[in-house]
């Protein structure tokens, strides 16, 4: 009897191991997969498109977020979190964003509300709450034009998990999204500044003032400074004019000869998170001269446009030219992960940001 029991246990272990291996194998064959949605792995060797295709980029944006939401059933900063904060501002050009993903965000809000507050303040959860709040705020700003009860609730919860220093907690291992409290605090700030009428109604709120001081007095690396500039474009008075202009010049100073930007030039390897990716980054064959990538080129162009740099500026025109000539056949733009050379999920934001940036330059025709 005992022997049969052991045999049964081993059969169960082997069966579970096979199922897990098959699941891992499935994910390795795709960057995103769910039902009929199948997006191949991201690769630097993927061929370029001969002509810019907004339709392919949008399909990648929509299908990637949908597949992640259905399969992973979690709010991730790099995929459906990015969709939530990016897609609504393209409503005028692309139509309404996915109701399915907004509904998922609302359900996540309910689950967060039922979570113990101390647990919610740990790990990446404060950052997830900030992304959720910003995503709902963006929907209100660009889709309905008015503050929704769900957004107000999300912002309230976001304040409940704010840290003593005025920041929002994060992990420190998965740059650029899950690597610093400064990054997550810029997300929270964008949520507050974007929600229709919310910030004005708060007045001299203590929590808001603590957050402002945290952002104004922090010493982030240049990627964090880029995010601070982004916040300042929506938050009048957050920065003095000369400080804001210095941030603009700092971004332009990183532009490469080909017109693009490289995320790797915005922080030393040891400055990302707790420095746990430094060995990987320093071992890359292009470490001394990192190439331009979709994530950083799109983000820099987007922020510079929102900071008031004209689309006709020759430096921005060079960036536009780079984006139009570097889209891949899948519709995405390539960006090598700062973390592992496996899924390269950063190509997702590295496609959303170029779309947003090109839209600010009038290159996506309104519907």
Model-derived regions, located:
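An alpha-helical repeat/solenoid feature that recognizes helix-turn-helix modules
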Residues: 23-52, 70-96, 115-156, 163-207, ...
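N-terminal secretory signal peptides that target proteins for export/translocation
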Residues: 1-4
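Active-site-surrounding "flap" and adjacent substrate/cofactor-binding loops of secreted or lumenal enzymes
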Residues: 95-115
